[in-house]
Curated annotation (Swiss-Prot):
Binding site for substrate: V135, V136, S137, G138, G139, D168, G181, D185, N277
Xref: InterPro entries: ATPase_NBD (IPR043129), Gcp-like_dom (IPR000905), KAE1/TsaD (IPR017861), Peptidase_M22_CS (IPR017860), TsaD (IPR022450)
Annotated source species: Mycoplasma pneumoniae (strain ATCC 29342 / M129 / Subtype 1) (Mycoplasmoides pneumoniae)
Sequence positions that bind Fe cation: H110, H114, D301
Disulphide bonds in the chain: none
GO terms (BP aspect): tRNA threonylcarbamoyladenosine modification
Gene3D superfamilies per record: 3.30.420.40
Name assigned to this protein: tRNA N6-adenosine threonylcarbamoyltransferase
Lineage: Bacteria, Bacillati, Mycoplasmatota, Mycoplasmoidales, Mycoplasmoidaceae
Amino acid sequence: MEQPLCILGIETTCDDTSIGVITESKVQAHIVLSSAKLHAQTGGVVPEVAARSHEQNLLKALQQSGVVLEQITHIAYAANPGLPGCLHVGATFARSLSFLLDKPLLPINHLYAHIFSALIDQDINQLKLPALGLVVSGGHTAIYLIKSLFDLELIAETSDDAIGEVYDKVGRAMGFPYPAGPQLDSLFQPELVKSHYFFRPSTKWTKFSYSGLKSQCFTKIKQLRERKGFNPQTHDWNEFASNFQATIIDHYINHVKDAIQQHQPQMLLLGGGVSANKYLREQVTQLQLPYLIAPLKYTSDNGAMIGFYANLLINGKNN
């Protein structure tokens, strides 16, 4: 009898070390060991520190997954994009396991895995093509045209900062620890949003640009801090945070609307760390197209999505 698929997914693109195990298209293990506390000390990810953390945590994560090595049929790892040193650690670990277990090795595009994480715990038959793949994370802001599981075309990307990167830098200027996204998200109040609080970024729909908005935020924060009686411990950041988030998310959504008009997709898939943002998730649901959004526990970098996308590719080739 043929051995059932059991795919080990390895994720080391940035600051999270993760192992996922996919058995017969279902997530059997989802282990994430984060080094965020280390990076909070410097206000952001230090590549060398992240790479060393992966070296220390990969075997630990594998052991915590509980996977029986003899049951593994394939080994998938995040091959690109990501921090070079971190990618090297993950690739070396994957190649070593592949050699020791004599199992096939699958290099996986980290961003494609984010997109298709929206299908985890869903019926794969819900996927209608062509679709738009929306990636919003700390390192990337992009829109893909999904023609098949194997054919994704990049149709829009950031020319400077990614949305998640701006969140972290603005949050740091406000005095929040890394990562700042969840704190900013918690401050959002739609009734505080004003149409002219910030100048809105203006770019062609195929390009995102957030460096100008980031500069506006730094200027506004500086002005707030210079006000008489300002106390960073008690200051109410809700209005600032609400307008920042509305501006940056609305800009992304407007580009998505343009992409919908241009390419006429049948549905939307949303993934990436910032896809955990409540306002972004809400805006995607209002785009009048069928949609799938990554479950919250799979929005950050994780090995489960690496293994899951590998599983889709293997089954897609066999069918």
